[in-house]
Amino acid sequence: MQIRFDKIPSFLGLPISDLEDLAPNQVAIAGYFCDNLDKTFAGQRYLARQLRYVSRSKAVPLNATDLGDLNVFPLETEKHFSSVISQCEAVLELGAYLVLVGGDSSGLKALGAAVQNVINPDVPIVSLSNNNKLNLSKTQKIILSVDLKELAGKWLSKPRRLNGLSPSQIISQINNIPNKIIAVAIFGLAPELDSRGSTETQVALNILEAVVKRLDKGAH
């Protein structure tokens, strides 16, 4: 009897790579499985897994890859941040763009520290809500924060508020940011793990795809 092996789920159906496979200007997407260190609420750590499960091969840049999940130590704060920062630095040192997916905003903090250490201490973190207020030059390198808590309640299975942004508004803002994005954190969503979470998971997947396309566009 022939045994059939299904393809391992990956972000956007992209190839799965190791660190040593990365090349300059490649977009590396990594899962961040930690949601108990900053602005915590349970379930955010499952976002990366859910996005992989619902992903299909899309017309996304071939210059992108799924790097797997970062090693995390959520019960040992100092060890955790040291490890995550080091792993982010290793990607950035290769000249690749890094996208962290899932978890709480502690991933963004670690990513910011890594960028400061590798690229420049003055690289700012820019959010969707403040990108038009900073008056940065178009050549300014930035870290983009995509906090999915900014989604309007109608797109979420467990809304915390009614007002907010639609998926198309978030994607439009991502596409129109004029600066050079070198790293991105997508976080803040605890998707339901059954059919109730299908809408919010698909919305997050579309936003991830927009981020990857925007990074690839900026590399050329």
Question: Where are these predicted regions, by residue range?
Answer:
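Catalytic cores of soluble, metal-dependent hydrolases
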Residues: 2-34, 40-99, 106-111, 131-220
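A glycine- and small-aliphatic-rich helix-loop capping segment at beta-alpha/alpha-beta transitions
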Residues: 113-121
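Acidic, His- and aromatic-enriched active-site or binding-groove loops in soluble protein domains
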Residues: 120-131
